[in-house]
Amino acid sequence: MLTADHPNRQRWSLAVTAFVTVVALAASACGSTSKPAGASSGGNPVNATFTYGAFTPVMVGWDPSTDYSNEIIAMNNMYETLTRYDSQTGQVKPLLATSWKKSADAKTWTFTIRQGVKFHDGKAMTAADVKASIDRTITVNQGAAYIWGAVKSIAAPNATTVVFHLKYPAPIDLISSAGYAAFIYDTKASGSTPPAKWFAQGHDAGTGPYTVAQYSKGQEIELRLKSFPGYWGGWSGAHYKNVVFRVVSTASTTAQLVRDGQITWAEQMTPQLWNSLKSDPNIVTTTATSYQNLFGMLNTSHGPLANVKVRQALAYATDYKGLVAAMGAFTPSIGIIPKGLWGYNRNLPAYQTNMAKAKALLQSAGYGPGGKAMTLNLTYTQGDQYEQTAASLLKSEYAPLNIKLNVASLAWPTQWSKAKSTNPASRQDILLFYWWPDYPDPYSWFINLFHSANPPYFNLAYYDNPTVDKQIDRVEPLSATNRPAAINLYTQIQTTLLKDSPALFLGTQTYERAMQKSVGGYVDNPAYPSVVFVYSLKPGQ
């Protein structure tokens, strides 16, 4: 089902990594510096600049059809989608489409396209451009293109109407709101140059409120965006007119730049640094539940963890409350679907720490205290402090059960390559791994992580349950026609997964943000991880 290339599922863990490794330097990294002209914490809002504090390079890619990594934070200010998901209400709202309707069988979706919209080159956007954008995304088939898997064909019968004809029912209104692979753009903007090559040169072709002003690869000020005068939303009232993406990999430096007003908004900090900013009267700190959770994927294909009793024993032996307390900025996970996303069920039979049950299960499998010793290999992403903390705690928690946990930190490409080995014996036993949805729907977790896949791609537990496969195959079409029934089916699937224990559900991340007090109107939207929709904000006077 998932055939597209996914270059970096670890994006947000790596961003945090850069921030968490140097807490001890918080008081010493840099002195006070002067505030630049147009900084958001003051000055004239007519020319106000919003400076985003990033921790890893922003523009990993430039192609709106294939982007699937850090660039989401910039792309969503240059490009727009047909719809946008409102996490506060759980509703899909109009954006480049003003309205839509579906057939009774949810296999035909008709969208009315907003008039008066221009691309950044001045060309008027029509329904034909919408069709061309999504057709190219499907044809290129990279990044998150799989989200359009239900589409059989797209028609643009006139300038303001787009019709999706589907192979099976799917929630196209929700899919159209995705932060990846759903951007509408001028597919002809590159002229005679191949689009992929043209985009890679640092060009954009969107309809969004901002367009590229300057790109400096590898520099601290990596990307500057400027307001697009022809933006359909208009520029009346107070808006940020410029957006800067500043890459600062040192935690203490970023915190100091926030204090000095040189960074408007910082995406994530250690709890220590974040708490240190709470007392500053010029800074606002916020928290928000994310849709990003941390898994311990268990190797069900080889070794001791091929035995479900051993997997269940590890699930009972894990101190979930202790884990989230030690990691900070996490809450316990109840099942797979995070709180705040439809399908979440707080009444699932989630595991609670029970060492007596863990010992009994291990002994029934021939292991445990007094039984055969067990050695397991765990890998985590190099430099990720949260994963490192989790790995250390799991090692100490499992030791009394006669389980030796060998822990290795690997660069993500190395870790992923090992996990995808076609030889089950070459894979790790436990892999620490983050996931978040490609659009605000539970389907992404289930089709990618727990549907059988050969060779493995993101099913890094190598879980293979034909009954669950059939349920996952049914649930996306059902979500478009009968959401209550889909929610019930997701509960059934999660109940089975909890029983079979192909993964440890270690926690859901909490976003801890810091921003200038002068920023008005900010609302965190976990459907778009760490994206700030700058146009919607109001700079302070």
Task: Identify the residue ranges that each predicted region occupies.
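Alpha-helical secondary-structure segments
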Residues: 51, 126-133, 159-165, 208-209, ...
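N-terminal lobe/hinge region of extracytoplasmic solute-binding protein
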Residues: 53-104, 135, 205-207
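Aromatic- and charge-enriched surface segment that lines or borders ligand/interaction sites
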Residues: 98-142, 157, 163-165, 260, ...
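Ligand-site clamp/hinge motif
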Residues: 230-276, 404
